[in-house]
Amino acid sequence: MEMTNAQRLLLSNQYKMMSMLDPENAERYRRLQTIIERGFGLQLRELDRDFGELPEETCRSIIDIMEMHHALQVSYNNLKDRQDIDARRLEFLGFDAATEARYLSYVRFLVNTEGRYTHFDCGSHGFNAQTKMWDKYLRMLAVWHACPRQYHLSAVEIMQILNA
């Protein structure tokens, strides 16, 4: 992260104020203040992650993924014959915190801050699937988008999406 001295001073002051306003997180803010003031390059990269950018297209894809899971659950609940579909496979697992942290962060924002998809079970890991999911979800989306009635899926369509 490249910052001028003036920008570093402003950010340092912000962290100082935050440490006073939020005593529970004061230690974290003081640490960040020190990193900014001293310009520790390695630790400044942490801030890059905090201030990363998630393009609009990616945000829309994540919402689409979550909407697909909602449609899977609604369709499953409306089925008369569930044909051995394991309901656990319908759950939205989230994303891998180690490799897909930006996606995971957006999911948590949507659920916890925006109040969307609050009916999804975040599990004990808070939507951390602990394995890469992005490519799997994109394959599932391709199949879901090809379905003529996306919110009234048959058991066969549900299985095709899950097995994508």
UniProtKB/Swiss-Prot annotation:
Pfam families: YfbU
Alphabetical list of SUPFAM superfamilies matching this protein: YfbU-like
Domain of life: Bacteria
Sequence similarity: Belongs to the UPF0304 family.
Protein name: UPF0304 protein NT01EI_2691
